[in-house]
Amino acid sequence: MKLSRIVRGANQWLSKTPERALDQAYRAALKIKELEDKHFQGKKVSPDTAQYGDSVMTYFEAELQGYLQTIKVRLGVFKTSRLFTSLSEPTHPRDERIALEQDSHGNRLLQKLKFIDDVISKYKTNEIVTAHSSDNGVIRGSELTPLNQQQVVIEANGKVPPPKKTNPQPAKKLTNLTVDEPKNKLDSATDKTGVLPRSFLNTINRIKQEIDPKSEETEEAVLKRFRTSRYKTAISIKFILLLIIVPLLTHQLTKTFFLTPVVEHYFSQHEQVVFINKDLEEEAFVELRSFEEALHFKSLIGIIPKLTQEEIEQEVRLKAEEISESYRLEGINAISNVFADIFSLIAFGVVIATSRKEIEIVKSFLDGILYSLSDSAKAFLIILFTDMFVGFHSPHGWEVILEGVARHFGLPENRDFNFLFIATFPVILDTVLKYWIFRYLNRISPSAVATYRNMNE
């Protein structure tokens, strides 16, 4: 019976997946519409339709990109899950009442899809041209398709209000806040092949703009780009520090004020528990034997007065109590670390889940740093990373890391697992790195790949 209930519940959940995904995409489209109506007079989110500062526009554009990404992902889930559910549905003759309900449900789905299409049609691009300048700046231009359809908002009770007539907006060009060159340079060397190298032509154009008083690259545009870059840098550094500080602070607070007292109380109630694994027990015995042998040795050579058997046993007993207390505390610390790390991981996940806009900004910031490096610097970092983690001497480092992790969690050292991990994980890591070099870096920066190969040889 339990198995049948589980299967029935799973089937119900799967059958509702398309509608659930569509509802999430629909809510994201409503958010975009609300953003347009509240801050952009019902027009598209763009610097051309409202007068806002750089920081405000960056915030609005980050909100927009998050909603558009949500719509894209959830519509993909809707299409995929609907395909599976349609294949798994049995074909039986439909009752008239059920047929009417299904037709009404289908109409609501179509209305939601139409509304989503109306909203995102403003932000679908007809043409995107990208060029890389000598300082690795990125130029983006986009033509936006006009909105020629009516927008329909579906209420929560499933009723569809009459559509409002809207005048189609003329297509306008969207200027990204991270534009590094004017848009009239978009038709430069990206689509043409000339005698001179592209970087040389881009350098000449940049110098011409800097010395030409009538150039479109005005001081105001330069200041705007600088403010945007400074804003992105500040947000990125704050977010990276937040990712480090919040988990560490959570770990220390939960371990100190909650976990350690609970584990200590458990050990005090179970005094027979001294060692949490055999490795710690063997270490304690070795330490006790070493102390006893050192005591005999010092007594024989006259460093300490000659001790009787009772005095030796007394010293050994005191040392055993000291070792017992030490390893008991180590066990308490290890158990507390396990749960404190779980709380830290939860805190880290919460920060990630609630900071999607900051993640996009950090990604853009790190991409700018990475791709602004010279080819030699990129090759040096790749070689350093590979030699450190997948190189000839990396097994020793991985062994130290695995032993430290086992000690941190109070786990007994497993040599077989360590050897298996060292034999497989660096190979997987090396394969992923080579694929990244072949798939992405070779396309973005071929000269960096050539420099890497020359330096590696």
From Swiss-Prot:
Signal peptide: none annotated. This is Proton extrusion protein PxcA. Pfam families: CemA (PF03040). It comes from the Bacteria. GO terms for cellular component: plasma membrane. Keywords: Cell inner membrane, Cell membrane, Hydrogen ion transport, Ion transport, Membrane, Transmembrane, Transmembrane helix, Transport. Required for H(+) efflux immediately after light irradiation to form a rapid H(+) concentration gradient across the thylakoid membranes. Together with PxcL, contributes to transient H(+) uptake following dark to light transition. It is a multi-pass membrane protein. Its main location: membrane. The chain crosses the membrane at residues 239-259, 332-352, 368-390, 417-437. GO terms for molecular function: proton transmembrane transporter activity. The keyword Ion transport applies. It is found in: Cell inner membrane. InterPro entries: CemA. Belongs to the CemA family. HAMAP family: CemA_PxcA.
